[in-house]
Amino acid sequence: MLTKYFVFCFSLVVFYQTTNISKACSFNCGSSHVITQKDPGGPATKYGNRYFTVEFPEKERPNDATISLYEDGRRQFFSALKSRGNMYSIKPKGNSETFKVSKNPQSTILDKQLSKGYILSYLYYDNGTIKYNGIPKPGRFKRDIDDKTLFFTHSTGKSIISYIVGHAICKGYISSKNEPINWPLMSKTLYNEQPLINLLNMNAGDKHTVNEGASRVMGSKAHHRDMDHITIAKLLQGTERKGNDIFYNNVLTDIVASYVAFRADNDYDKLLKMVFQDKIKIENEVHFELHRNTSSISEKLYGKPQIRASYSFMITRGDLLRVAVSMMKDYQNKTCVGNYLRDIQKQANSWPKYRPSKKNASLYLHNYAKKYGGKFYFKFNQMEDRNIMATEGYNGQNIMIDMDNSKIVVTQSAATAWDQRTFILNVIRYGKLPK
């Protein structure tokens, strides 16, 4: 009888604790689970038929040999871009500031992700100090990841383009974020005379012109970066805006990047150096991919940045953190660029892919954002009243900034196969790393 009473009491305690944990963690509880690799310890696998092994499909769970193969492929792709004149580079000025770094606190599940999972770089910055600085241990991959390793930003580069737009406005190259697009190159397209903010907010009414998944323009078989913006403008000739819903796509931000080059004109290189060298103070060279020249060499604009710029940056882990810190300081200090960031936050629109309860929602940061504007995500579930800004790039190249508490998480990863709640959202929400 006493045993039954003890079991009953113990069950009540467990029920009470579980219920309270559930209430305390009704959202964003996260998971420490390391998603199992396909054929761990096996040979490398090449997905698809692309010549360069650059990026995995999001659904794949590659093993370490495959991750190594794709890192080699990225390096080969970088070299090919550079040798063919399809890369724009900004050299460091030698004025980078060294981060203050403290000893990593114990975080068993984060360590496990770095040793067996898909996170390749994890930086947690707290009030001027890197509190966690994590990369896989030497020897895990064919090439060790270090502070010189270049990563694609993917769509996080869209947010960097927006940050450059802010600088272009503050330096007078662009009159305001509401400036009508008056660009001869795009004068016969749907973008003509639209306010720039429409393009920044991804509600330019261009859903009928772009294949969302394949980044193809007007049914073209070629990827949009395999043609310059003269060719793209010809494909778009005669198009008109349809609707004002958010249509998230890759083509539009490259058009914005090239618009900045058009407005800055001969000062374009000067503008980029001001942003990356003088403001961000990069430590290593930063690159971005250029659209291929496909128009006639007799074209007046042939080869110029305004027909070739893109958001596809290649940057080191430390310099991506420097980008985030620069954004945070501008915002906090209410500089001209900081006020631009505040304005796009105020004018952000409802994000149509807010779905925190969806199955596997935790694999994507954007599932927890309620607002999108100026190529940033805002208003995160359970943190709506806080000034938090985030970026998200394919396969986990992400930034989240807590403007109120000076905390930043920057990640680079190999695959879409880890819990964004545990390693990003929770860290910003609670201000501490997972145990």
Predicted features along the sequence, with ranges:
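Catalytic-site signature segments of enzymes, centered on catalytic residues
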Residues: D144-K148, N211-N293, Y311
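Active-site SXXK
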Residues: F151-S176, L199, V256-V260, L320-V323, ...
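N-terminal leader/targeting segments and the immediately adjacent pre-domain N-terminus
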Residues: S22-I145, C170, I174, V427-K435
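Extended ligand-binding groove/face enriched in aromatic
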Residues: Y118-I119, G134-S155, V165-A168, N182, ...
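Active-site helix/loop module of the DD-peptidase/beta-lactamase fold
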Residues: K171-K207, R263-S310, I315, Q332-N333
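Classical Sec-dependent N-terminal signal peptides that target proteins to the secretory pathway
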Residues: M1-S26
